[in-house]
């Protein structure tokens, strides 16, 4: 399988451009190519394809504080991005798609850093029982992608201020708040 690393000499932190680049790469990925796209957004809540922004996010507060709201192609929950968060996207054709192998890249990177990470459920990667990486997926006719977050130094106060999570979901996870469920590396 061929591989590629897409980047820029200047880090682009525009949420709309980053999501557009992700879609462009998906549409132009060669058949035997695996692309790893690394990106960051600043002060942004990104919601899944079918989410209601007003149920997932305090949109008024986000807007008042100069934040931005964006919608991605994939499903999954709302996430908060700031410069303490690194985003990754694996783009590949459907025949070569291997979620476990892709997750192992992230888990292996954590091992190199001396951290024991583990997959939990379909779309989380945990350290010490707390999520530092949430993942989501999207496919079209020939290609698909798997993207996720890596929380390195996310502002947890801001994350908690903007994101709203149903009490039922928190109860199912056995935690009292979003902040108590997630962690920075």
Q: What is the meaning of each model-derived region?
A:
Residues 85-122:
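Contiguous, small/hydrophobic- and glycine-enriched helical/loop subdomains that border
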Residues 55-57, 96-101, 158:
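Short, conserved charged micro-motifs
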Residues 73-91, 168-185:
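Residues forming anionic-ligand binding surfaces in small-molecule and nucleic-acid pockets
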Residues 113-114, 133, 141-185:
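Long, positively charged amphipathic alpha-helical accessory segments at protein N-termini or as interdomain linkers
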Residues 1-7, 12:
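Single conserved hydrophobic/aromatic residue that forms the stacking wall/gate
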Residues 119-136:
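Beta-rich nucleic-acid/ligand-interaction surfaces
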């Amino acid at each position: 399988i061929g591989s590629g690393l897409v980047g820029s000499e200047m880090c682009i932190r525009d949420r709309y451009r980053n999501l557009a680049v992700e879609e462009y790469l998906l549409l132009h990925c060669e058949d035997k190519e695996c692309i790893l796209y690394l990106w960051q957004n600043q002060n942004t809540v990104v919601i899944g394809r079918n989410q209601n922004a007003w149920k997932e996010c305090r949109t008024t507060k986000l807007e008042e504080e100069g934040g931005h709201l964006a919608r991605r192609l994939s499903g999954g929950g709302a996430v908060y991005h700031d410069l303490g968060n690194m985003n990754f996207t694996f783009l590949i054709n459907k025949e070569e798609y291997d979620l476990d192998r892709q997750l192992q890249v992230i888990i292996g990177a954590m091992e190199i850093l001396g951290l024991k990470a583990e997959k939990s459920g379909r779309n989380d990667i945990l350290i010490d029982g707390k999520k530092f990486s949430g993942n989501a997926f999207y496919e079209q006719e020939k290609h698909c992608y798997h993207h996720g977050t890596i929380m390195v130094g996310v502002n947890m106060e801001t994350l908690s201020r903007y994101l709203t999570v149903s009490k039922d979901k928190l109860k199912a996870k056995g935690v009292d708040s979003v902040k108590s469920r997630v962690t920075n590396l």
